[in-house]
């Protein structure tokens, strides 16, 4: 996974990832965000066979708090040990760049907001220094995400919000054009410093579909026009990957994704947002890979203090279904938020040091599909969703009910070798028939 052209210091030890059979396995969509890539966290990510590791350790405000000439950068504020550990383990690290120093803010006091026009040159210098430092050995960062959910107006969040808050609700394109101006300053130095690096636009929140707003939506879903604003201002030449975020909700015992009224006309939270982004790109003659840089199943507000067994089981269902769907939709990756325990509505895959069922489901999925390639979507079972995956010695079907509640009895195809539940426990069909509601793996002869 480490770049072949990188040349470490001859006096230093180069840690390469374990490579089986003298060639690396094909990339998968599996990923997660971590707030601290500690030794234990890295081990958990390795066990889950993650490919992507997203990490928000870069704060321009912390690195360059004071404007000086020449610039003074405080790299000691960056968790370099964590970045090195992630590289040593072979992960593709997505490094999130955010937080604007006081002296560079377009809106005074708003750390999460846009950069002032007269500070873009300093930002460009910072990007060059950043990429020059963290793209070579021993960090090998190749994916740089600029901002986090920038399609939010600063009036809607605290000034130091984790949201990107580049939004402008008075603008036709909600501020996307000005974000494109920033990309024009960031992209050239990034590519000059590391030609094989990729610039990712900050993961878009995409609150709802502007072409089909749900009833009572006061904004008319205008924030989702942010992406079009980027393209309308010729921003397509200044980024490599589109990123978006999506959070399904556990509601009254079921998974609210496909039926979410904000995106149901396009197929739900995941499929709908992907469909929307691809349509907007098509309208502008653009074709870029898409990354789901945050995703999770959230508990409902009243169930968040102590999540029940039903929520935890549904979350495990969603881990499998959303990764299968991301793979089937051709996404670059699917990054779960977060690997460790999260204060955000029980989204994390651990409770302190104890793995949730969702983590166990991810571990089995990664093991079952190791070295797999995508086959075709499975559509013959009305009411179920599924995909076929190809491996050297077998085919694997994954089937599930989209709401996690409404199941269906199916007749199995010929050539079935084994059937497993989402955790890898064997299931026994009865007279070649099987009840499917939760994610189910069906192994078939090649």
Give the role of each language-model region.
Residues 17:
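Conserved functional hotspot residues at active sites or interaction interfaces
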Residues 53, 86, 130, 144, ...:
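Conserved, mostly hydrophobic/aromatic
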Residues 380-415, 422-423:
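Carbohydrate-binding surface patches
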Residues 427-446:
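C-terminal beta-strand-rich structural cap/linker in extracellular carbohydrate-active enzymes
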